[in-house]
Amino acid sequence: MVTKRTLASRALTAVIVLAAGVVLGACGGDSNSSAVDSDDVEFVQGMIPHHQQAVEMSELALDGRAGAAIQELARRIQAAQDPEIVAMRGILSRWGIEEDEHAMHHSPDDAKKMGMLTEAQMSELAMMSGAEFDQRWIQSMIMHHEGAVEMAEAALEGGVDEEVLAIATDIKSVQLAEIAELRALLNG
């Protein structure tokens, strides 16, 4: 037997289910749709290999060839950028976009504009140690960070994805502070 209470309960359940569907639909959506912003994609695709190179440079500093101050900074750079690489790969996955392993290698000029070291420069750095390594590493990391700041600023100007904008904001803030620290080490 259907009572007023049963009808009211069913109506309330239907409203809750409908509301949940609307909320979930708004949260999900088609992540592969054309709504993905090209500035966001360009930033993420470019920043992954950019960060990977900074991590490689940090690994060189952590293998015993660098002074204590450089090693400490290299640890912080690696600790900050490894999780950002993971996060950016997650963003690409959410969008249904493959990682572009050659994003920073379209031309040597493009890579240089973004502060990337060439393979020859990385090899040269790997052959150094002591004060010579420290000085070259600092100079290279300043250039590298300046490129990352430019990339982050471009993402902040043209991007729309909230997660991408948060990463770009963090990169800009952290790397500007690290540039100041690197310059102090270079001049100190």
Language model regions located:
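All-alpha RGS (Regulator of G-protein Signaling) helical domain and cognate RGS-like helical scaffolds
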Residues: 6, 28-188
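Bacterial N-terminal signal peptides that target proteins for export
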Residues: 2-15
